[in-house]
Regions:
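Gly/Pro-rich active-site capping loops and adjacent beta-alpha segments
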Residues: 1
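Feature 926 captures the class I aminoacyl-tRNA synthetase adenylation module centered on the KMSKS loop
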Residues: 4, 8-326
Length: 326
């Protein structure tokens, strides 16, 4: 089949290589005193983020092994891309900062374990990537002195899932934490609360399971969502932006963060504009004459516009509703 040469995809893969390079640089700078052949910690002594990334890498290598056997190299490449970009760079490296830069929550032994894990995971990631992107992985291997017993990555063995710990419960715990952080970030974005502004969080209807998960992950949530306090409440909450995580309500009190009345007026004005645009687009799409005579790409473009405007309308209505909730 014909494969389109897409410049946007080329740019995306260039960004991926840059991200991988920066990740390797971060690991190297933060593990200067750690030997590359250091023995990894046993599963029971690993911190939550370290056990999580090993578990995710274990599943990745299992998936790669399966897809190589059926010659689905495309699925191998896609799964590596998703793991490196999302799990390793966007989440794990950020989680390790909470450990490495901590002044009170984590001991020196904890920090050393995480540094060893950073090196071991990056080592396996580079070796797993090497058949797909050989030049950049070889360059990283040599440029950052990422050399164990092999001078070149190409003569290193492919990583095996058996060398990694795996714990399904840990994956669930971090996924819960990710949803918690993502919900807070989404509220920040929708309510125009700057990421640099520290905020308090209130929790309503939290189950015992939620509280147990919070107890294990709160230090990471506070760092990644820039939160200075998380409290549970049973009384009526103050005027807040609300998000749901299962049956639990996550609330960000709005007093002092935004001018509520001005923001409501701005959103109501924006909603009217979106409703007018949506009505105009839908009228054209409902016109049978137009649909039968217009070029296919024009109709498809209008359908896409209608979908995007509908999504924007729902989002703005939700923001206005949140300002009225208490």
């Amino acid at each position: 089949r014909d494969i389109r040469f897409d410049l946007n995809r080329i740019e995306g893969y260039r960004n991926f290589c840059n991200k991988l390079w920066n990740a390797a640089r971060f690991v190297t700078l933060n593990t200067e005193n750690i030997a590359h052949n250091s023995n990894p910690s046993p599963q029971e002594s690993l911190l939550l983020p370290d056990l999580w990334i090993q578990s995710k890498l274990h599943l990745l290598l299992q998936s790669i092994e399966k897809n190589i056997k059926i010659y689905r190299i495309d699925l191998v490449a896609n799964s590596l891309y998703e793991f490196v970009w999302n799990d390793f760079c966007d989440w794990y490296l950020e989680l390790t900062k909470s450990i490495l830069y901590s002044t009170d929550h984590f001991s020196d032994d904890n920090k050393k374990q995480t540094k060893v894990n950073l090196l071991n995971v990056l080592d396996k990631v580079l070796r797993a990537l090497h058949p797909i992107i050989p030049f950049i992985t070889e360059e990283i291997w040599k440029s950052f002195n990422f050399v164990s017993s092999k001078r070149s990555i190409m003569v290193s063995s492919y990583p095996k899932k058996e060398s990694l710990c795996y714990d399904k419960i840990t994956i669930h715990k971090i996924e819960w934490m990710q949803s918690f952080v993502t919900n807070i970030r989404q509220i920040r974005s929708e309510m125009n609360i700057a990421p640099k502004v520290q905020i308090p969080i209130l929790l309503q209807d939290a189950s015992e399971g939620d509280l147990n998960l919070l107890n294990e992950t709160s230090v990471f949530i506070k760092d990644m969502a820039n939160v200075y306090e998380i409290k549970t409440i049973t009384d009526a909450p103050p005027l807040s932006a609300i998000s749901l995580l299962g049956g639990m309500k996550i609330l960000i009190p709005l007093a002092g963060l935004i001018d509520i009345e001005s923001e409501r007026k701005r959103l109501e004005k924006k909603l009217i504009q979106i409703q007018n645009n949506l009505s105009s687009v839908n009228q054209r799409l409902e016109n049978k004459n137009f649909k039968s005579k217009a070029p296919k790409d024009v109709v498809e473009n209008l359908v896409s516009q209608s979908e995007l405007l509908s999504q924007d309308k729902i989002k703005i209505e939700r923001q206005i509703e949140m300002m009225s909730l208490s």
